[in-house]
Amino acid sequence: MAQVINTNSLSLLTQNNLNKSQSALGTAIERLSSGLRINSAKDDAAGQAIANRFTANIKGLTQASRNANDGISIAQTTEGALNEINNNLQRVRELAVQSANSTNSQSDLDSIQAEITQRLNEIDRVSGQTQFNGVKVLAQDNTLTIQVGANDGETIDIDLKQINSQTLGLDSLNVQKAYDVKDTAVTTKAYANNGTTLDVSGLDDAAIKAATGGTNGTASVTGGAVKFDADNNKYFVTIGGFTGADAAKNGDYEVNVATDGTVTLAAGATKTTMPAGATTKTEVQELKDTPAVVSADAKNALIAGGVDATDANGAELVKMSYTDKNGKTIEGGYALKAGDKYYAADYDEATGAIKAKTTSYTAADGTTKTAANQLGGVDGKTEVVTIDGKTYNASKAAGHDFKAQPELAEAAAKTTENPLQKIDAALAQVDALRSDLGAVQNRFNSAITNLGNTVNNLSEARSRIEDSDYATEVSNMSRAQILQQAGTSVLAQANQVPQNVLSLLR
């Protein structure tokens, strides 16, 4: 080996080994201080990617476990509200059993019904106000999806149902004794002013078109004559002047005659056939037998009130009265009877004018329409029958944009048939939902247990890849420290080797 002083190869070799031991010492200290075997991707590129996927899965499962606990909480909140509803239903059933006893007086039944109504109102309040984190759990049918896994589609659904007196079928529950409804046909001398001259001046073109719906031509009463059918006690006129598409509207129409001789054409009038025996009349006919005229006026009044013309056929004016459990007769007002249905009405005994009581409401298209007030519907209470055929209880009118009317009062309460059966069905409905909520809580508990086990196993697997083995790292640190000390000492010796060349220069 040549003796040189410009390059000290032994010193360079010693420095290189010293750097290696210093790097090993730094790595060992970093791992011991952080607790991690992988502090950056350079420590273990593949291991870092695997450990990161484990971390994402572990964090997702941990959050899923918290979600499942939220699911349990909302199910418990809902089930607690249902328990209160169940308590109210049990009391309602108890009261219904009490009401079935014939020893109860009418006042007893009224008191029982009052408490039942309050209990049902409380059920509605609980249904409308119970919420979890802003979600009303019983106010409407709803499905809540709870994420119980770290990946898409790993969910459990909570099916919530609207539970109130209406969905339970108890909104019209009534245990009061039914009233016996009676009606007495009203017979009146509709036109008493015999000799009054008939006046058709009101049946001008505008009035006729408004009543018949025609628009083409100039309509008028042919000859200005009114004809009277003595057999049916009806008045008729012949209308002409319609042209074009409305020419078919020319013909005979039945008209109404007031006591002052005024002749009017009912709204929605349709063409009819005048009896062959009808004769021209210039004066009001005094009628001795008036039911047919009353019936015609009643029909027209119902049609004006929004009732279908077919349903209004055969309508008659009747006086209503009710007999309670104690045999007391309660006089009611007038009604228009059409088949087995009754509609509230006003009747002017002086003039014979008949008018159906109506309620205005806003239809789905935003237009204001008129509906007749039907008495004694399926639940025994006043109902509103709209022009589109839908029927609403008066008590629910506010929910359908009806304008309040004093006529919408309870007419005749009808006792609910088989009330205990209806209440039992309601209890079964509540029990079914409570069972579903109990079952889903058990599912959540099972999911939480499984999530915990999975998180533990994944954490152990990640630890084997990512965490420091302190026994190994302490050993590595000790070895590196010894090598550092030895390397430093040897480097000092190696740096002295070039001085040997000086002995050759002496």
Swiss-Prot record:
Family per record: Belongs to the bacterial flagellin family.
Annotated Gene Ontology cellular component terms: bacterial-type flagellum; extracellular region
Cell location: Secreted; Bacterial flagellum
Biological role: Flagellin is the subunit protein which polymerizes to form the filaments of bacterial flagella.
Sorted UniProt keywords: Bacterial flagellum, Secreted
Pfam entry (one): Flagellin_D3
Record InterPro entries: Flagellin, Flagellin_C, Flagellin_C_sub2, Flagellin_D3, Flagellin_N, FLIC_barrel
Protein name, as recorded: Phase 2 flagellin
Domain of life, per lineage: Bacteria
